[in-house]
């Protein structure tokens, strides 16, 4: 996911291709991996002589230089969220333990440090859904099945539109069940069921719209896989596809809900407001492509900007440097768009400022989460080392790919 994003934005598998259409198959799939580094032979490359040392750009500059805040409900919500998703997919103890390390609640906690426990739980559960759902298209059975991908999205759309059958925790489609509970919750106030004013029809339409953008990106990704065009695209075409398939758009709007932000239509529909969403999605995916580079090499994931630029003739270090330039350009684009935004009036501008805070927190949370959980590294300690030294160590035999 995102999309969030795994060079694959989904970090819930180790690359084994297993269908996940039924509860039993989800359990089989989930037993194979998780959201953290899980390669038994990784430690054999401790000798730096066997490693290519890559220098990363400063990923904590500009908008990312601010300190992060953690939601005070984090600990209690994490325990409940971890237990619930493990129960729904009927996971074994090994997967449940690994899932705790993935810590989707920490990610949600940085995204929305001031939201209610109900909203934080919903955001954490949305993360679990998004990564499970995305795996099917990323490295799973739908990655090269265009008709199957379109069909699964159609069934999920029916849930969002309220025309699908009611699923249960014992359903043969646990991923759909999770999404249905999310739709139920997002229609309510972020304070809880019947605890406040329900979401407006206007907001729910925006929430559906953001998910449609995500699904369009997934279909484009699968089509690219089927056509074998992963490395023949230019950077702009790649960004256009990945900013959708990353899953950042619906995650961002989900965080708007967590804060009770309901943008007026003239604000939500303004091209510069959408441009800021595009810019931050680009920033998130480009950062992700650097940090996920080794994992993507291991799993054979092609949708990665570093790999794309290497296919164009750049060395690995040159490609990473170029992605760093693209990230810095995101900040320039952001400030340019911000300077050109009109004033909409007191109430609308207050909502807009909340939206801008959500955008910044989303990018910062995604960055911190990657280091803290060992998402792409062999441990939290290794993630801390990479952050401190900005050195990414890649086995030379792998770096040649």
UniProtKB/Swiss-Prot annotation:
Annotated Mg(2+) 3 binding sites: 288, 292, 296
Amino-acid positions noted as binding Mg(2+) 1 in the UniProt annotation, renumbered to this chain: 134, 139
Domain of life: Eukaryota
Binding site for Mg(2+) 2: 139
PANTHER family: BETA-PINACENE SYNTHASE-RELATED, TERPENE SYNTHASE
Domain notes: The Asp-Asp-Xaa-Xaa-Asp (DDXXD) motif is important for the catalytic activity, presumably through binding to Mg(2+).
Family: Belongs to the terpene synthase family.
Name of the molecule in the record: (1R,4R,5S)-(-)-guaia-6,10(14)-diene synthase
Lineage: Eukaryota, Fungi, Dikarya, Ascomycota, Pezizomycotina
């Amino acid at each position: 996911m995102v999309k969030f994003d795994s060079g694959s934005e989904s970090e819930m598998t180790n690359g084994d291709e297993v269908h996940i259409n039924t509860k039993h198959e989800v359990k089989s799939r989930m037993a194979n991996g998780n959201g953290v580094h899980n390669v038994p032979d990784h430690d054999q490359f401790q000798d730096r002589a066997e490693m290519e040392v890559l220098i990363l750009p400063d990923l904590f500059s500009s908008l990312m230089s601010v300190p992060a805040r953690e939601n005070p409900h984090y600990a209690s919500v994490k325990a409940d969220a971890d237990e619930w998703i493990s129960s729904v997919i009927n996971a074994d103890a090994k997967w449940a333990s690994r899932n705790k390390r993935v810590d989707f609640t920490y990610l949600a906690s940085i995204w929305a440090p001031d939201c209610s426990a109900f909203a934080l739980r919903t955001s954490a559960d949305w993360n679990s859904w998004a990564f499970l759902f995305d795996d099917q298209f990323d490295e799973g059975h739908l990655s090269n099945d265009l008709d199957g991908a379109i069909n699964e999205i159609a069934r999920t759309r029916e849930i969002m539109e309220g025309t699908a059958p009611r699923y249960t925790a014992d359903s043969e489609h646990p991923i759909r069940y999770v999404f249905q509970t999310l739709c139920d919750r997002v229609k309510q106030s972020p304070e809880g069921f019947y605890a406040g004013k329900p979401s407006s029809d206007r907001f729910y339409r925006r929430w559906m719209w953001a998910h449609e953008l995500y699904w369009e990106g997934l279909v484009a990704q699968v089509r690219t896989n089927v056509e074998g065009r992963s490395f023949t695209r230019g950077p702009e075409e790649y960004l256009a596809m990945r900013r959708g398939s990353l899953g950042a758009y619906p995650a961002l709007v989900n965080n708007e809900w967590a804060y009770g932000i309901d943008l007026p239509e003239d604000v939500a529909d303004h091209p510069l407001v959408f441009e800021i969403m595009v810019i931050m999605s680009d920033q998130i995916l480009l950062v992700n492509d650097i940090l996920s580079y080794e994992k993507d090499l291991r799993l054979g994931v092609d949708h990665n900007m570093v790999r794309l630029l290497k296919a164009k003739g750049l060395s690995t270090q040159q490609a990473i440097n170029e992605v760093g330039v693209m990230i810095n350009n995101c900040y320039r684009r952001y400030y340019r768009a911000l300077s050109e935004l009109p004033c909409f009036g007191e109430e609308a501008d207050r909502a807009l400022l909340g939206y801008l805070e959500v955008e910044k927190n989303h990018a910062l949370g995604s960055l911190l989460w990657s280091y803290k959980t060992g998402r792409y590294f062999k441990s939290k300690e290794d993630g801390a080392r990479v952050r401190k030294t900005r050195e990414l160590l890649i086995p030379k035999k792998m770096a040649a790919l």
